[in-house]
Amino acid sequence: MNKRGKLTINLIRNEESTMNKNGKKLGIFSFLLFLLTALFTLASGNASAEETTPAVSVTGKFADTITIVNVSNNEGGDLNWDLEQWATFRINATYDLAGKNVKAGDQTTVTVPEALIITSSSFEIRDINTNEIIAHATVDAENKKLTLTYTDYVEKHSDTNGSFFFYARIDFKKHPQQGEIPVVVTVNGVTKVAGKVTFKGIGDGNPRTLTKTSWVNNTDYKTVSYTISVNRNRQNIKEVTLEDHLKFTSASYVKDSIKVIKGKFAYVDGEWQFSDRVDVTDQHKITIAEDGQSFVIDLGDITEADQYRISYDVRLNYQPVDGELLKNDATLKGKGVVIKEITNASAVQIAGGAGIGYVFTINVHKVDDANQPIKGAKFKVVREANKQVIGEYETDENGNITVNALLKDKYILTETEAPAGYVIKDADTVVNVEDFGTD
């Protein structure tokens, strides 16, 4: 006889573990879903700021409002690893306008050291409750400077305070060597120590048969551009095909954006350069799958003298959020060679006064009617926004599954296979955005 049970969902924040939501009966087993929010505060970086001079009051149009500056990884946590050449990190800051007599048009400037580059675009700092603009943050990448220009919001509200962050990376042309880099920012001419980062150095570029890079358009964040570099290490391969497959479904390839360019690769001053370019797109067969989620390019036989760069764009049909990773695969196949497969994750990085990162967790606990753990139940977790499969999981001997690195978004938990002696009645369990809480 197949067993039946109950599905109980309790939503608990890790800051206040005594809070819960009334369980709802959905059918067959008992689950305990813990939605753990870990909203990073700006004090959780590698090092808090240390002022080299005392705080200064407002003088003219410059408002000295920054109280703390620190560095963190892209998700807001500790940056405890060495940075690669193009790797980014966050610079976080808190500000407090209390007692500063700040007026509309007053400014605060933040300048990063010569060894860094600001990679964020300009953004706005807003009131988290009313969405009113508190300040415009303008990025001057060439001069390594970010300027806050305050609006009349600051004259209509008292004791305004908050936080913001932006992304940066190592300027490897000015600092190519391996080693530790102090992150000392200048705020209105006053230096503040934000912490330090360690750079791996530019190295030899790691020439490979297949390399894939991507970046997100920083205008609307809905267009992702990809480049695939083929044969940087100068191999001879017969009957070469290149396959690309999107791992998120709420998106499609931009029509006519796929280009095949032939040229020559060279690693110069820390960057791969591609010269002597010739567009050979019309010389190669390109097949796009009926579902629009993959394509295949027939490159034919390649010699050590044949090097290619394939480029294309993908358009999302939803609005991504800061911290989101957009993954897709590329595979190179050839006669008598090992398949070269790479997975590329393009990170959405939107600077602002608040951020959402991969800091949420779903814990599933499965028990029978006697409240004993059940091993071997299989589940699939899908993010609703882009239909991306987060992963497939199986309960352990304690009846537990842990799904880490989630955005604060809607997810569908689908039971795909029940253990022996049990049946699936209601396969899907929905986790909504509001279930995670607002902390």
Can you describe what each PLM-predicted range is?
Residues 4, 9-439:
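Solvent-exposed loop/turn and edge beta-strand elements of beta-rich ligand-binding domains
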